[in-house]
Amino acid sequence: MEILYTEITQDLTEGLLEIALEELEKNRKVYYIVPSSMSFEKEKEILERLAKGSDTAVFDLLVTRFKQLPYYFDKREKATMKTELGTVGLSMLFRRVLRSFKKDEIPLYFSLQDSAGFLEMLIQLRAELLTANLSVENLPDNPKNQELKKILAKFEAELSVEYANYSEFGDFTNRLVDGEFDQQLKDVTIIIDGYTRFSAEEELFIESIQEKVARFVVGTYSDENSLTAGSETIYVGTSQMITRFRNKFPVELRKIASSAVNEVYSKLTRILDLDSRFVITDEKIELKAEDEKYFRIWEAENQKVEIERVAKEIRQKIIQGAFFKDFTVLVGDPAAYEITLKEVFDLYEIPFFYAQEESMSQHPLVIFFESLFAIKKNNYRTDDVVNLLKSKVYTDANLDEEVIDYFEYYVQKYKISGRKKFTEEFIESEFSQIELVNEMREKLLGSESPLQVFLGNNRKKTGKKWVSDLQGLLENGNVMTNMNAYFSAAELQNEHQMADKHEQVWQMLISTLNEFLAVFSDEKLKSVEFLDILLAGLKNAKYRQIPANVDVVNVKDYELVEPKTNKYIYAIGLSQTNFPRIKKNSTLLSDEERLEINQTTDENQFIEQLNVANYQKNQFTVLSLINSAKESLVLSMPQIMANEQGEFSPVFQLFLKDADEKILQKIQGVNLFESLEHIGNSRSVIAMIGQIERELVESEETSEDKRVFWSSIFRILVKSNADFQKILLDLAKDIDTVNLAPDTLEQIYGDKIYASVSSFERFYNCEYQYFLENTLSLETFENIDINSKIVGNFFHEVFEKVMKETDLSAENFDEKLTLVLQEVDKNYSRYFTQDATARFTWSNLEEIVRQTATVLKATVSTDELKTLLTESSFGLPKSELGNFSVDDIYLRGRIDRLDQLSTDYLGAIDYKSSAHSFKLQEAYDGLSLQFMTYLDVIKQAFPNQKIWGALYLQFKNQPINLSEINQLSEIANILKESMRYEGLVLEDAAEQIKGIENIALKKTNIYNEEEFEQLLKLNEEHYRAAGQRLKKGKIAINPIMKRSEGIDQSGNVRGCRYCPLKSICRFEANIHMNEHSREIGQKSQAEILAELKGEERDE
């Protein structure tokens, strides 16, 4: 055995390739072994080096991995008919083994038999024992491990009897010892590159083969000091490995001759070396200003700014002649950076390969199985059924996608949930597409549907029967047909990567089912157990990655780095929390147990002590990272990461201790003090020019800023870039609406506009809201709570029926109210039993009704105010109050109560489920039209009677803070004060109204006859103005805004506060407020009244 070592600042691979070429000249077969995590990149690098930069093939040199070696020497056909289980199958077998134990046999682990996490830990433990050349008997003796021994022993017994699983690598090692391959190995050279430690399994293989080959070479990183310094070294793992090999067999140890070294990276290595030795020295290693060319540390504002600066530098170096393949981006948290990096690199037109395994969990087929499992487990929850259908895998042959939308709308609106409701006919006949929805429901969810045939009963079946039944679902439910269609469509559109994904997922399903049959074929299972086992194999599966072999930027986890990786290295997202990465031992064996195993086992048996191994690995990873660049290295940390303040890693602090200030660079978003650093490509400059423009406007000019540069860039873009010109033209119109065409107006309105009173209040809140909700009839899903329409209708119906009762008096009021409540409850029960929120609301309704009814009871008992009509309508067929129109606008509505004073004055009572009061300002701005319209309708219907006004009555169950009262007797008065009518009253009737109990009268809401008439005219003017705009087809996005309120905490102006349609109009208060909102509340009450009395009103 030869062990060649060199310092990590040197090129180890260059020295090993010289040996490989020597051996090839001797006509020897060379096996060049590299770590599995970098085998593809290393093979590509080695072949390019041998061919001096161009692609080539060298038939007698194979870059490979330890576990692949048996394939090259053992060409025997496997003569077994047994199934070989993969990771999914092993998990299934462990599950079956666990299910075979009784609770008293494995009390600690019995409850974890279906835990995916525990099954994964068992697979991991078994794999560790194999690579450590250990068996279950080597586990320390304690109650936990006694259970693990039982589980693993039974598992191995069943595996060896029923399946073809065995360690090919271990078997190959045993056959090497027996001399089976001696003849083949005579002209073989084995070279090992990049290892700093080996597993027990690998060491046993090395011991078995190293004397049988022509030449056996191990190349690694170390220095003379480390070979004698023991543990106090940056090469501690390597020195331990070399010492172990030298003690076991003859070793020729030599150092590879020095080549040219980058002094900056040598300094960084020396800093780490001194730190790892814990020595106090007078040696001062400084990073100077000129070292910035080779090494920088960035402190970026945030992740996006950090990635953008990487992208800008890549684009600039490309212009200078570099290739994309010359760049490697290493990330501290691959999952956290994936989305942002892809977006930024796409913007900067940088091709890249992101070496992050992608889960299959988002594929439609996996979503289908997840939904299928959830449907059975949770008894057909609404969302689970909708997700199943929206996966578009399980469909009817001629299913229109629009029908799925109708179906979703129906089941969400009517809260359809539970198997019974989905298998029975939908009955809400007022739903316009009920026939289409029912047809789809019957075919896909009905009692004879493929889904119900598969899931319909809860009987246990054998595994093979479940697989057979699933095949029927896949065929009859068009799952197979749809998967084939997805694959063909992707191929047809040249989306070969997507087509490959479809194929991989389908193959994974077939493989999982085959392994399921191998393990559970004769086991009896319920459907939910079958789906759970199946899903465990699918949702954790990953797509195979095809490494990039073209001119692209490579992006990967920084832990996969190796020395001399590339010319330019950007290691980003390196914070205190992940650099170095601290890993906790989450296996079934503690560090103490691992130490005990290693102290009691034979020479070629040892298991990794994770606390020690992780420390050594972290140390070597940092060492590899700072030596990974050939020309330029950047280490970067964002100040904000995952919404938390980032802190410098100890490694950063170590390098910065004696570094020039130029080494640490603050990376900001675009600003006026930098120029060319921010130029990447034209698309990215266009994307950030808005920020630059804002900076130009908001900041004061200084002698140091680059505003002249940015103004020039702006002018160049305006003149030469058509895309930028279009953006500029569209900026001011990004939410501008287009007037409706005359023929469209004719179709939607005709000669007359028919609308409700409340809809015009919506018009004055925002014209676009009116257009969407009233013209286009868009509806939002309504959950039944205290503010929903259903609850409002419930209250109205209760009080309408009570107030219509004959012979109603204060004495029998409560009795009649109880009877009415019972009757109305029956009518509304289907709404209030839809879900938990609805049931909770229902439980509170009676309290609210009875509390509000105290006011009505007082009204019934007085002779001063009598109810003439309840729920009297206008503008509807057979309306009690007739029709009401303003020019060509025909209004409809319903007045909750028409009440008459003893003096024959008429007025309106309006019930509300939320707090309301009459405000002159809102009537002036068009936001409060109901009261004045109701009074206008009454005046028209009863021309010979005078009007007293209109009042609101809120339905509520007033809460009382008991800490604020002195005696319980005060509660009745407090409730009485809180339950009052409020509104506007005419001056002539004010005195009489004041004398009626439970009416709160404000001086500001008492109006004389002249003011009342002016208010009626103003109200009609609002309708006319709105009608004219509608008939001209004008629709503006103009939510109301009160200047004194501005933008609230949720980022809305007043008109958008409760609007559910913002995703359609895209109104953003901070951008559009000044141009697109309608300002209200600009006049005082005195000014409004003065204007009503004769002055011209501003429109």
Swiss-Prot record:
Which keywords has UniProt assigned to this entry?
4Fe-4S, ATP-binding, DNA damage, DNA repair, DNA-binding, Exonuclease, Helicase, Hydrolase, Iron, Iron-sulfur, Metal-binding, Nuclease, Nucleotide-binding
Give the EC number(s) under which this enzyme is classified.
3.1.-.-
Does this entry carry the keyword Transmembrane helix?
Answer: no
Which residues take part in binding [4Fe-4S] cluster? 766, 1056, 1059, 1065
Gene3D superfamilies of this UniProt entry? 3.90.320.10, P-loop containing nucleotide triphosphate hydrolases (3.40.50.300)
Cofactor: binding details? Binds 1 [4Fe-4S] cluster.
Lineage top rank: taxon: Bacteria
Biological process annotations from GO:
double-strand break repair via homologous recombination
EC class name: hydrolase
Q: Does the keyword Transport apply?
A: no
Q: Which cofactor does it need?
A: Mg(2+); [4Fe-4S] cluster
Q: Which terms in the Gene Ontology molecular function aspect does this entry carry?
A: 4 iron, 4 sulfur cluster binding; 5'-3' exonuclease activity; ATP binding; double-stranded DNA binding; helicase activity; hydrolase activity, acting on acid anhydrides; metal ion binding
Q: Which Pfam families match?
A: ADDB_N, PDDEXK_1
Q: How does it assemble?
A: Heterodimer of RexA (AddA) and RexB.
What else the UniProt entry mentions is: Despite having helicase-like domains, this subunit does not have helicase activity.
Q: Which family does it belong to?
A: Belongs to the helicase family. AddB/RexB type 2 subfamily.
| Function according to Swiss-Prot or TrEMBL | The heterodimer acts both as an ATP-dependent DNA helicase and an ATP-dependent, dual-direction single-stranded exonuclease. Recognizes the L.lactis chi site (5'-GCGCGTG-3'), which stimulates homologous recombination. This subunit has 5'->3' exonuclease activity.
- The protein depicted here goes by the name Exonuclease/helicase subunit RexB
Source organism of the structure = Lactococcus lactis subsp. cremoris (strain MG1363)
Q: Which gene encodes it?
A: rexB
